[in-house]
Amino acid sequence: MIVNGKNYSEEIKKLLTQNSKNIDERFFGNNSFSLVSLCNGNIQGFSAYYKISNSLCEIFLYISPELIDQPEEIRLLEKLISVEKGNGFETLKVCVQNLSEHEKYVCKRKGFREETSSDTKNDLYKHI
């Protein structure tokens, strides 16, 4: 997967094979949300969850290493994805806060959400 001219295939493979203590296991396996709808059904191998903090909705993407580059379908994702490193864990992150209003609207229609003031600490991690 190429984002902003950089190939993230190796990072993605490391992410998928890494055993991280930082992520709640309920967000893996059959409980993972498929992002196929985000890509109009043309891409397989996405799963995600989001973390809400300080008015920022961070969407963490887990991408199958077998995923073939399909730039047209992931054009929106390419603008949003960044690599976050910390506490020995590396992940791909989408920051909804950094989107234009139009892109936020598109993302919301496809299942993303931003924090509301009613979100509580117990809701820090929510499954999409």
Predicted feature residues:
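C-terminal "cap" of GNAT-fold acetyltransferases
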Residues: 110-111, 117-128
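Conserved acetyl-CoA binding element of GNAT-fold acetyltransferases
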Residues: 55-66
